[in-house]
Amino acid sequence: MRAIQKKSLCHTSIISCWRRREYSIPPQANFGETFLNEKSSRSHQILRLTVESSAREFLGKDKSTTLVASANFVDLAGSERASQALSAGTRLKEGCHINRSLLALGTVIRKLSMGSNAHIPYRDSKLTRILQPSLGGNARTAIICTLSPATSHIEQSRNTLLFGSCAKEVVTNAQVNVVMSDKALVKHLQKELARLESELRHPVQSSSLETLLKEKDNQIRKMEKEIKELKSQRDLAQSRLQDLLQSVGDHDLNRQVQGKHSVRSPPSVGMPPSVSRDDSSQVSHDDSDLYKEVRCIESNRTGGNDQLDLSAGESSSPQDSNMNSGLHGNDSNASVNSRHSRPSGEAPITLEEHLENIRRPFVSLAKDLGSSTRNSSNLRVIGRSRSCRSLTGSTMFDDMEMDDCTPLNRSLVEFPGRPVESHRRGSALHYDAETDTLSRAGSMSSEISTFKDAKTNGSVACDTEFTGIGEFVAELKEMAQVHYQKQLGDQNANGKSIGLDPIEGVSQSPSRWPLEFEKKQQEIIELWQACSISLVHRTYFFLLFKGEAADSIYMEVELRRLSFLRDTYSRGSTPSNAIVGSLSTSPVASAKKLQREREMLARQMQKRLSTEEREHTYTKWGVSLDSKRRKLQVARRLWTETKDLEHVRESASLVAKLIGLQEPGQVLKEMFGLSFAPQQQPTRRRSSNGWRYGIPSFA
């Protein structure tokens, strides 16, 4: 780079002058007389002071350094207008050079203040070229502007202010640069080359920085997990406090109601003779809300098909709801009234009655199937052998014969009546254990069904098929009897009436119920996973029962049902007394059903979720966006971690979104007396014969 040439430049060493404390700057500035000023600067003056600092003693070749610093003191000549200065000749040329250099300096400062990476024209003038390190390098710059308050110079004053405001925006970075000699630079490069060669020969496996980052990431994950646990504990404590306050308020209300009513009613059906209830005719409409009933209701959801599900629910409407009853050809109708329209002398339905009513549809269905197959030449005769009678005992089929002439109870969900002419046409009723559906295996016009052979020899025994559910119902009846005996003893000791205390056992110890609910909920979740229960059933149950005091009986029934199913699976083979289709024939079959359900949920993700929601779901569930079959990966991770309640809650939320569950509260809690798993129903191509049947599944 060629050095800057200037005639008036001079270089003077001031070492000797500094020691003598006397030094004067030689006069290099040019001054001249103009119309505006008698002594006007006709050139810029720059004074550069360079200071070098080095050690007084020799410390070695590597440590012999010298610090060099420079300071520029610049006196800029003022700009002038030729029309006002009335300059000519030499004064005019000097003014032109001054204005040109000031214009170049203003351009450089304006572009530096903008902070852009555009080209900076330092070479437009010698002034900007000399001041380049001070303006945009590692230096600190201070500028003093001189203005004229005269009105005639207002434009020059405005330009000067603009120049000063731009100079304030210039950012510099003052730092010390290390200038190395050629020998020192060669030695430094040789050392660096040797270091790089050694690293290539012996590569470092992992740096300490990467290890430190991994440790920090692990700490962050642990802290996030602890925060989630603390939040869940806080929410749980708040829910416990609310339940406790609500239970105490309900208990006080029950005591006030019991003090007002002392009328006794005759013993109700299914209760010991010593147990009495208050006459409901003496209780007002508000007091009748205290009764907790278990009833079965009919829900027609198919739009044009007569599909019937067995369900249970609390009737909240004061109006009467009449339902047609009929079991495969029975044309008689029975009305089922809600609890507010029930006769005043009739007691509420007990749990024992409800469990008995659950058993009756299966018994009646089997009897009707047996009678229809005896009248048809195309079907095999379903009979009872002596060996079957010995296995089932003497109660179940005797009860079946007695129930033939007994009218249906008000809590029973009636099966839809079928046309009379359907008795003349027959085909085999096929219940698929894999899909929990009833399908017809005969011709297109066949509407009579029979059970599929449970064994390879083709013999079907109706009484042995119903012993499994009979044992389960008997077990639940025994549980209900113990529950009532305990309630009776406690209320006799306290002198209270049973009919006015709808929440037995739970209201007596409200503080223990939240802990008991958590324990039972965890056991139920683990049993769901062990028995391969439907994910939809888990979701409905988990979202519906939040730990209220009235949920205790449903939690107990679900726990008993799952324990019964687990014990059945633990025997290693399907028991001969299990209902065909009501229980999964083996753990392998249950696992296959669960796998098909996960595939169904994976297909629902494409329909229910948008692209952004699917990507968010993949990220949330730890599925790589670049992997294949991402939806199936998410579906396979649902309800897998039984110990993590947050995982269970997220799984239930996602499944509910995929199946279109808007408000879990719309589902009646009593429907969980039976199973709530969705059932696929076979459809007929001809709309005239589009009968569809449904049966509850206990798996």
UniProtKB/Swiss-Prot annotation:
Residues 249-345 are annotated as: Disordered. Residues 276-298 have a biased composition (Basic and acidic residues). Residues 179-247 form a coiled coil. Keywords: Coiled coil, Microtubule, Motor protein. GO terms for cellular component: microtubule. Residues 264-275 have a biased composition (Low complexity). Residues 1-170 form the Kinesin motor domain. PROSITE patterns: KINESIN_MOTOR_2. It comes from the Eukaryota. InterPro entries: Kinesin-like_fam, Kinesin_motor_dom, Kinesin_motor_dom_sf, NACK_C, P-loop_NTPase. Residues 313-338 have a biased composition (Polar residues). GO terms for molecular function: ATP binding; microtubule binding; microtubule motor activity. One of its GO terms (biological process) is microtubule-based movement. This is Putative inactive kinesin-like protein KIN-7B. It comes from Oryza sativa subsp. japonica.
